[in-house]
Amino acid sequence: MSKIVVVGANHAGTACIKTMLTNYGDANEIVVFDQNSNISFLGCGMALWIGEQIAGPEGLFYSDKEELESLGAKVYMESPVQSIDYDAKTVTALVDGKNHVETYDKLIFATGSQPILPPIKGAEIKEGSLEFEATLENLQFVKLYQNSADVIAKLENKDIKRVAVVGAGYIGVELAEAFQRKGKEVVLIDVVDTCLAGYYDRDLTDLMAKNMEEHGIQLAFGETVKEVAGNGKVEKIITDKNEYDVDMVILAVGFRPNTTLGNGKIDLFRNGAFLVNKRQETSIPGVYAIGDCATIYDNATRDTNYIALASNAVRTGIVAAHNACGTDLEGIGVQGSNGISIYGLHMVSTGLTLEKAKRLGFDAAVTEYTDNQKPEFIEHGNFPVTIKIVYDKDSRRILGAQMAAREDMSMGIHMFSLAIQEGVTIEKLALTDIFFLPHFNKPYNYITMAALGAKD
């Protein structure tokens, strides 16, 4: 029997553990260490909880220690791993306040990521805090269930009237909406001059920016935060251009991979993530890394990349589980497919934006089209959809796609995700069999029309 130690039990770790136990039973001994008090919190639901769009956090968990142990794992919660001896193959963790040494045959890192702490005066985390507790009251980081619960409790204080959200990526934009729905004044700050810049081209980010402004969110794009000021608690946030009187500051500038346990022994990617192959194996044989702490193969760029998404965490966990248990399995790569819904504006994307494709050296072009989902004689449930398809002019290969609408058209992006994965050309997409029925779409579907419009 082989002993497999898993460090971390959130999305990637949970998927990995369940895959090993349900597919290989008691063929292996599975031991798990996690520094948190809970597992499987769906951080994507944090904004829904804060904005009172769901009743409470109970549905944001899908597994727990008891379930994993019922399947056969030994799980140590609130037990941070202190060190790893890769030669002796031992893991030392702090269990109930005492050092606990566990041997292993295979090791799987699912250590995730942690919030980026930007060089901002006044923005500091308390020494030794595992829950990203700031030294300044009402300066909040967003990662764990505990962070969300803390923010929600503080929002009951009627003195907190104005909130600044720093970072206009997915999390920042969702939280800005949530605080406004909660009745707070909101200012959204980002050093870039738009929002969601990593996922959409400028015309669609402008659409989202206008959407937020129409709902009362103050946008402060193109501003660099210099200081969070206050006497013991947040009182104002200072940028290179303005000062804003606020009662709470949320830092949502992104996450960095948590790879400190590599201890200089494991090869790292340029951003510090564990560098892995398609089996999720690191540079040390028998040591795997999954989820936000690891790299992943990007089918759009056809190269190794870092794309921190819960969907990727689950897939990498499954791949590592089979390999650690002796079944040779390679991941097929990802496209970074994602989506967002703010005040009823739905946007989805996959692969590369035009701007990013050009920055990476592709001779890229875009074809775009806006049309109603259904024929005009369908008077109800009809809505306009905007689509953009990015492709390489040399190979004609589809590199990315973006869609926006006021109704749910999200399933369409999966076609483009598969197209990027399989190297489909823009010409082949134009001839793809897309059915027509007026209840659903037009004879010339907007996907077909956009593909036919590719002239370069």
Curated annotation (Swiss-Prot):
Keywords: FAD, Flavoprotein, NAD, Oxidation, Oxidoreductase, Redox-active center. Pfam families: Pyr_redox_2 (PF07992), Pyr_redox_dim (PF02852). It catalyses: 2 NADH + O2 + 2 H(+) = 2 NAD(+) + 2 H2O. One of its GO terms (molecular function) is NADH dehydrogenase (ubiquinone) activity. The keyword Flavoprotein applies. The modification Cysteine sulfinic acid (-SO2H) is found at residue 44. Binds 1 FAD per subunit. Coiled coil: none annotated. Belongs to the class-III pyridine nucleotide-disulfide oxidoreductase family. This is NADH oxidase.
